[in-house]
Amino acid sequence: VEFRGAVRPRTLDRKATPLRGNALAMDWNPERARVEAEANRTEHWGHWGPYLSDRQWGTVREDYSADGEAWTYFPFDHARSRAYRWGEDGMFGICDDHQLLCFAPAFWNGNDPIIKERFFGLSGPQGNHGEDVKESYYYLDNVPSHAYMKALYKYPHAAFPYDDLVAENARRSRLDPEYELIDTKIFDDDAYFDITIEYAKRAPTDTLVRITAVNRGTQAAVLHVIPQLWFRNTWSWSAGQPHGRIAPRSGVSNAFEATHPDLGTYTLYYEGEAEALAVENETNMRAVFDVENAQPYVKDGIDRAVRGERGATNPDLVGSKLGLHYTMTLASGASQTIALRLTNIPPAGEPLGAEFDPIFAERKFEADRFYAALNPYPASSEHHRVQRGAFAGMLWSKQFYYYVVRDWLRGDPLQPPPPESRNAGRNHEWLHLYNDDVIAMPDTWEYPWYAAWDLAFHTIVLALIDPGFAKRQLIMLTREWYMHPNGELPAYEWALGDVNPPVHAWAAYRIFQIEHKMYGTADYLFLERVFQKLLMNFTWWVNREDPHGTNVFMGGFLGLDNIGIFDRSATLPTGGHIEQADATSWMAVYSLDMMAIALELAQHDPAYEDIASKFFEHFLYIAYAMNEGDDTTGLWDETDGFYYDRLDLEDGRRFPMRVRSLVGLLPMIAVETLQPQLLERLPNFKRRLEWFVANRPELARNVASLSAEGLGERRLLALLDGERLGRMLKVMLDEAEFLSPYGIRSLSKCHQEHPLSVNIGGVEFRVDYEPAESRTGTFGGNSNWRGPVWFPLNFLLIEALQNFHFFYGDSYRVEFPTGSGKLMTLWDVATELSNRLIALFLPNANGERPFNGAVEKLQRDPQFRDRLLYYEYFHGDNGAGLGASHQTGWTGLVAKLIQQVSEYESAGKSPLDWEYEAMPASAVEPEIV
């Protein structure tokens, strides 16, 4: 096997050693070669990709209002007519990596009031559970270089039910389920088109496009297909900015040239009879603001022309936006394909000639080979389908994101000045922030903006297929034009200063381990770069979130929107503050992750040994404060065998907040094992460890097994010792509490019969078990951490169980489920939880995929039942998908779980069966998740 990878840093030059026993023998293939070429900067295959957002309207970036109501300032009804300032959107579109030139298809069924050029959905205020896309579409395939991509859109023959979707969701309360497109019955008689969009690259800047429509209905139907090419409007905001131009290519039929000073010239070739329609990508001022237009051919002119309006487009066929209008009549079951090609390379022959279809076939074959090499284990075809679908969704979710806070606050010279109040409003403390990158988004319609902790989980999945991109994402987030000068990482555009869990050190080390294991590359330069910046972030956490110096942390909502009885980002109605079990757990995890990275780097630079000792001490102090401390700090409840947040009132009274939630389970994830070989190689660190055991026993006894040695003479650093771990697992693995058929619930089911209620000044604050959507409007009401199953924290709990097993071995067994009498090792429990999560997407004994819920059409119809959606979260009892429907972001972690389960089950063993030499030579623990 030939291993290729990143250049080693000058001071950390240990050679990458292919690993015995657990290294994947990755077959070299063309797609792997393209990924390596991109990483090594020899070919820029990532220059073009699916970087066009699904939604730009309703975002903070486009909001110039005084009140910060982004949804109402730029609503869906403006999107077809109003130029965007900070980005573009479209359906299954592509663009260059700075989004100068964009391509996307649009459609019209002859019945809709507008052409379908972007996905429709409800804004936050319109939805009974917040914003929600109301379309039927699927990401089918993609590869890291985007040399092959495929997606599917289901478009009804009848008029799209825009008004019905808005009205019915407005009628429903938060106690009702969302009203989805499938609920309108518009697909019941199969009167719709299946439209497949495929892209294949012949070269990095030579993209072939194939759009195929199939009539699934019993009657003939007319479909209009309008491929569109346009330049992002960069010229309407300040003088002297480049203005792209699209015009017919001289002397060549069925071809248009798109020329831009910074991008050069691209040609769009197209086949067949299509009516060319050209306009400027500029606002229709008459339609939006009821004032005169500066020129006659504006952004929505193509929409109006397709629907029959004359004079809406430029007869000279020149502009900054082009539409090619095809009309096709399809009999029942019939299909038709349109071929296009966007390139800056002169074709050797006919641009849409004999090589066109073979290039698609070749790229599809290479994609199959790429994924077959990635997971060569004998998993079921369904496991492979689910894994590949997760990778596809993750890659389709890469989006160009542009946001310069200083310019956004000040406004643009050629536009009316924004309200003065904005200078003290949203994100005004982030004037340094300058984002101009391709970023892996949580969901490109519902969450078309990065979220700091989501992104960390995305990189774990991306590291399997494109470690170079995964590493660049983490490095990007820690660069000085993202990270605040005080060390804080930007959370998300709605509130850059909100606090997200500090999972980035964990992600960095996992990426390092995954790449080392799968590709034989140990990229110490990456690890060191991220570590140095995270030192600043760790310091920010210590200085800001532990204001009392007790090593018990606050932090705010920490990504778990409505999990507590109070809004943890707001001023408490009781006064005082909350000492948070999850914030403190996260800091314990952060300390251990930074220690692990420092120990890895200390193998090559002794200076890191002292830093590792510093983080070791941080962990000891946090463990003491959380587990024991004095009368004012401990969060462990000995009676309940659980961790709770604590409410500290201003008069000195303190009350545990007895909510059984993931907050109380999070201390379990603070776990790290130390190899004996590592301690021998780092004598200074070992001496410091042993000094604490001898001289600070009150600190050492709060760590699981600092002095006692476990399997293989390993040491265990954890907040939970074996006894407390067992007590917490008894609760976590109880089907009447946390254990769902599909993973670990975010809130114990015990609160279904025993809700927690507090009355303050006549106002009731209450926590109930809510296994489906949220019944409150907290944080927009579109997320719910009071019962559903979420992938990211399930993933961390699974990893924690594996790490505990790495120390305790097979002798430590627990009941699974609690009360069943069946004993399992911690490794087997982790595997069972993994399989329960994976089962959300697999056909059950009745042939039904749990994520599709009780919708008969989705479960039984052959055109729907095998199409996969990776929802934001899942019903705590029946597994139905909820929230954002295309959040392959962190739900894409199912791909990593499938990889792990496939590998270890095929070998019939856990990592404990491997020889230590098969592990990275200086690893704190093996890469086991």
Task: Annotate each language-model stretch with its function.
Residues 3-8, 17, 22-81, 93, ...:
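Acidic, mature catalytic/reactive cores of soluble proteins
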Residues 90-94, 103-106:
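Structured, charged N-terminal subsegments at the starts of enzyme catalytic cores
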